[in-house]
């Protein structure tokens, strides 16, 4: 299945948000994904909560597809890559082989998050706490009062909607705007086994201040749609 994507402007740059929760940056030939949480199921299994042990394989298969279909030559993961520091040691052989092949095929950078305090580059690629590319900061968690354009993860935002009297939840990006036609963005979690926080939660809205507007953005009905979450007082 081709991961359909939708173009939009962010701080003067074209980005494409895929229906499968990845963000492609055409000018940089870069694919950005947040919160993979690889080996989350095996972490819970070690603590007595048995879950199907296929989350890492599913996440990596989806990521490989996104790389093929976008033609990305660089990957930036925005933190919380493995669910815990021992996750790389628990990868089953097939998933480990997939990850090794991916990190050899593209220029791969792991940005580290709160789950990655002791992460080592044993899975391939390189490690960084944050980067700035073309004036846009990439980091795991939005830095409150950051004045530069920023792409981050951490919060796993999801939009809650009521459709035909049914409540549904969909992963989304959350995008803020400042008074200069730019802003910051929190990406949805890409991992197969990740929960989510309501996109309008005060923790998310506070993290993106200062702002003049904050919207949830997600693909729906074959297009990219925006739902207002917060507006500055007139």
Residue ranges of each PLM-predicted region?
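Extended recognition/assembly regions associated with phosphoester-bond processing machinery
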Residues: 1-234
């Amino acid at each position: 299945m081709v991961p359909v994507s939708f173009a939009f402007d962010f701080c003067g740059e074209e980005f494409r948000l895929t229906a499968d929760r990845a963000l492609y940056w055409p000018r940089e030939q870069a694919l950005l994904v947040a919160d993979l949480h690889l080996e989350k199921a095996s972490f819970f299994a070690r603590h007595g909560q048995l879950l199907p042990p296929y989350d890492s394989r599913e996440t990596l298969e989806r990521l490989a597809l996104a790389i093929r279909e976008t033609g990305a030559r660089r990957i930036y993961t925005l933190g919380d890559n493995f669910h815990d520091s021992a996750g790389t040691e628990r990868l089953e052989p097939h998933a480990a082989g997939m990850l090794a092949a991916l990190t050899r095929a593209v220029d791969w950078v792991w940005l580290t998050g709160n789950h990655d305090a002791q992460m080592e580059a044993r899975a391939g690629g390189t490690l960084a706490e944050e980067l700035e590319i073309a004036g846009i900061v990439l980091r795991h968690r939005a830095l409150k009062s950051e004045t530069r354009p920023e792409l981050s993860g951490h919060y796993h935002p999801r939009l809650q909607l009521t459709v035909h009297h049914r409540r549904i939840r969909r992963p989304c990006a959350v995008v803020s705007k400042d008074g200069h036609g730019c802003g910051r963005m929190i990406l949805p979690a890409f991992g197969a086994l990740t929960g989510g926080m309501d996109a309008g939660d005060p923790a998310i809205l506070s993290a993106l201040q200062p702002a003049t507007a904050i919207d949830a953005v997600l693909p729906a009905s074959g297009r990219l749609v925006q739902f207002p979450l917060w507006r500055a007082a007139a």
